Amino acid sequence: MAHKKAGGSTRNGRDSESKRLGVKMYGGQVIKAGNIIVRQRGTEFHPGFGVGMGKDHTLFAKIEGVVKFEVKGAFGRRYVSVVQA
């Protein structure tokens, strides 16, 4: 009897596409207006001086300058700013 029984169905075999989140420009790097600094879900980093936030919480430079990361406030919030070089 050279027959093969039907294989059972599997519940695996799927995976979502990666979203490429994270820091795109690091502290001390020169940046132009409109460049993306951080792609994130929620406000892991908050916008500081010279930085805007998109509707998906992406942080981007509003002015040309140098990226600066800092921790401020009683809650230890992390802020990203752009300071003019």
From Swiss-Prot:
GO BP annotation list: translation
Listed Gene3D superfamilies: 2.40.50.100
PROSITE patterns, sorted: RIBOSOMAL_L27
Stored InterPro entries: Ribosomal_bL27 (IPR001684), Ribosomal_bL27_CS (IPR018261)
Keyword hit for Transferase: no
Region (Disordered): 1-21
Molecular-function GO terms, alphabetical: structural constituent of ribosome
UniProt keyword annotation of Ribosomal protein present: yes
One Pfam family matching this protein: Ribosomal_L27
Family from the record: Belongs to the bacterial ribosomal protein bL27 family.
Record-given protein name: Large ribosomal subunit protein bL27
Classification lineage: Bacteria, Pseudomonadati, Pseudomonadota, Gammaproteobacteria, Pseudomonadales
Name of the gene encoding the protein in the UniProt record: rpmA
